[in-house]
């Protein structure tokens, strides 16, 4: 354990209910105004791996789906950005799109399982790129995989070719690309979209990195790997999404919050509160799971036993929604608690 982490732990104990960073109160005010540029306020040499980053699971479903099954978000990508979401789980598959009379071409399109969203991958990237152009102090993370459940559009070689071409085209501008390194800093990431792909579309990533060793087990894994062109990092990962054990899911979420807080710089963490209870991801089962887990993590981050360190990337369902029917989802409160955690302890700085 380094001296910087010892300092963080000691300072956190002294200021449990008061933000260490003076701009934390400003951040809360910005959120209420719908313009939450919280990354802009962080020091350039802070390690990105130790940040607390709110993210959305199957982010594009909030822009609309062809039917409600598998809809995990209520807000559009733009609305998610406005509330401070900076990590986006996107699932591009592909489909044929009409380009003229009797002319069709394959195009990357976002799905959740067999459910088609109303958003193309190009459109989703454009939303993020436009926001970064307007807010160059921010950055975004895309966590993606090949969603290949369609019986018609499931050929891996087609997807590989489409993705390789897209990530090197003008649709993914060169100024948004960045190669992954474990020790990336906030300053290096400003204005960029870091792409972490769970499926390798080429021998080496065109931008960002590939992720291997993904796990859906209740206990998660501390041995997944993020591999960039020239460097790799350990990934601590919890994505227990088909929740047969409510208490086990909550315990795993809180365990990975602690693991993230105690990790050395360069170790990354992705922690999902998302998922569903029961046997199928229906609207009700997704919201019940969100209520169970979002409240638990919110209470943990705002309570007296909160971890004295970053949470890593937290992916949740129904961001921005406080309640829906009988469910208290805390989709508004949890992302802000994650954001505020960046200002609750001294960040470890590269070179210091």
Task: Label every PLM stretch briefly.
Residues 1-5:
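Sec-dependent N-terminal signal peptides
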Residues 8-11:
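C-terminal motif of bacterial Sec signal peptides marking the signal peptidase cleavage site
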Residues 15-83, 96-134, 203-205, 273-352:
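Long, acidic (Asp/Glu-rich), low-complexity accessory segments flanking structured domains
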Residues 43, 129-137, 186-188, 260-261:
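Acidic (Asp/Glu)-rich catalytic clusters
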Residues 49-54, 86-93, 139-144, 193-197, ...:
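Structural recognition of the beta-strand scaffold that forms the well-ordered cores
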Residues 93-95, 105-172:
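Metal-dependent phosphodiesterase/phospholipase catalytic core, i.e.
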Residues 154-166, 206-215, 326-340:
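Short, aromatic/basic amphipathic alpha-helical patches
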Residues 169-308:
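Surface-exposed substrate-engagement region within the catalytic domains
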């Amino acid at each position: 354990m380094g001296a910087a982490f010892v300092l963080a732990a000691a300072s956190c104990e002294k200021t449990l209910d008061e933000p260490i960073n003076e701009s934390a109160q400003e951040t809360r005010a910005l959120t209420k105004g719908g313009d939450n540029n919280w990354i802009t306020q962080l020091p350039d040499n802070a390690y990105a791996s130790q940040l607390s980053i709110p993210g959305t699971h199957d982010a594009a479903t909030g822009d609309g789906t062809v039917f409600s099954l598998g809809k995990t978000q209520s807000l559009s990508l733009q609305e998610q950005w406005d509330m401070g979401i900076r990590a986006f789980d996107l699932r591009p598959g592909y489909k044929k799109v009409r380009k003229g009379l009797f002319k069709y071409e394959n195009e990357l399109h976002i799905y959740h399982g067999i459910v088609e969203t109303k958003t193309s991958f190009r459109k989703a990237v454009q939303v993020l790129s436009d926001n970064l152009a307007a807010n160059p102090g921010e950055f975004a993370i895309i966590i993606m995989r090949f969603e290949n459940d369609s019986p018609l559009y499931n050929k891996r070689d087609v997807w590989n070719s489409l993705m390789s071409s897209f990530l090197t085209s003008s649709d993914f501008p060169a100024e948004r690309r960045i190669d992954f390194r474990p020790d990336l800093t906030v300053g290096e990431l400003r204005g960029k979209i870091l792409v972490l792909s769970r499926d390798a579309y080429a021998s080496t990533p065109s931008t960002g990195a590939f992720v291997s060793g993904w796990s859906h087990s209740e206990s998660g894994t501390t041995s997944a790997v993020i591999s960039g062109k020239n460097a790799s990092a350990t990934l601590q990962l919890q994505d227990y999404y088909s929740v047969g054990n409510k208490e086990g899911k909550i315990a795993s979420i809180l365990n990975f919050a602690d693991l993230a807080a105690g990790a050395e710089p360069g170790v990354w963490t992705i922690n999902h509160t998302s998922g569903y209870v029961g046997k199928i991801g229906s609207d009700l089962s997704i919201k019940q799971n969100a209520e169970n887990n979002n409240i638990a993590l919110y209470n943990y981050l705002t309570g007296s036993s909160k971890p004295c360190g970053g949470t890593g990337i937290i992916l949740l369902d129904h961001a921005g929604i406080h309640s829906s029917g009988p469910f208290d989802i805390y989709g508004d409160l949890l992302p802000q608690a994650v954001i505020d955690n960046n200002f609750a302890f001294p960040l470890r700085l590269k070179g210091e």
